[in-house]
């Protein structure tokens, strides 16, 4: 059990994540908490610092690469160094947005005004398409594969949209986007979960399926 007695900054936990070295991260209404099994470390907005959390309301936490995390707040995305224990970059996103990434750091963001990817050469997010997708519930309708592809399952359909880039780490003028749309399932897909090359999905009949993308 982990609560205020262990140093949790707020009892309303909005998200949790286990990083690549086994530490547990909790996003709350009052900052980010890191739990190593014995002690709690709390990170909040501190505007006396040059880089800080955009906001203390934490919506999601995910792996950015082998040394950083993505922390999504109410006012934007923060790149957080696990080694330095501090925010190293801020990216403004307003409204509803959803961050999806894999362990290699290939990162996409779905928003109401478009789809973005993180260009590691420029170290910023670049929009690659004006969105025609409803962003509602996209936190559970998309994932990034091990090779960096973005798989999106639009609501009320059995379709899949595949987005892929030739490179994440080159000048944006040299980046080529490929998009394909395919029928994936005979019934509407409601929820998905992806891990280690396999994803599970539940359709509108509440039947559960497992799919090996390899």
Question: Can you say where each PLM-predicted feature lies in the sequence?
Answer:
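Carboxylate-rich, polar loop motifs that coordinate divalent cations or form catalytic acidic clusters
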Residues: 1-214
